[in-house]
Amino acid sequence: MKTFGLIGFPLTHSFSKKYFTEKFASEGLQDHCYENFSIEHIELIEKVFSEQPTLVGLNVTIPYKEKVIPYLDVADEIVKQTGACNCIKIVQGKKMGFNTDVIGFGTSLDIKLTHTHTHALVLGTGGAAKAVQYALK
């Protein structure tokens, strides 16, 4: 079994578990499951890691995109530059952090922006806002 999941708090707004459960089923991935790990404090991520031996990946949502970084063994360059992580890959117990928000926001912005757009107003200061700021550079 390969376990994937989402960490954050609260997770009542999230559609991730339903989406990925349906996606795994439609792709014939019976050995894959997706769980929500609603943790009130970031320190509880250690419990998630220790109690989920089949865990291979996590999505990270509010309020932990910034707070999760000290729990990573490796962070990619974008995580280092933005100070935000939204995706963790676990290989042989090593937790590697990535920021895929930058790619998503960047792709969306590239469709709309032209060379005449020289300024932007980014509302917010959290992990997603940091990804947007990075994508706008």
Sequence positions of predicted segments:
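Intrinsically disordered, low-complexity terminal segments enriched in Ser/Thr
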Residues: 116-118
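Conserved beta-strand elements of the Class I
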Residues: 5, 121-123
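Glycine-rich Rossmann-fold phosphate-binding loop(s) that bind the pyrophosphate
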Residues: 9, 124-126
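Gly/Ala-rich phosphate-binding loop of Rossmann-like dinucleotide-binding domains
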Residues: 133, 137
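Phosphate/diphosphate ligand-binding glycine-rich loop within oxidoreductases
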Residues: 2-113
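N-terminal Rossmann-fold NAD(P) dinucleotide-binding loop
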Residues: 129-130
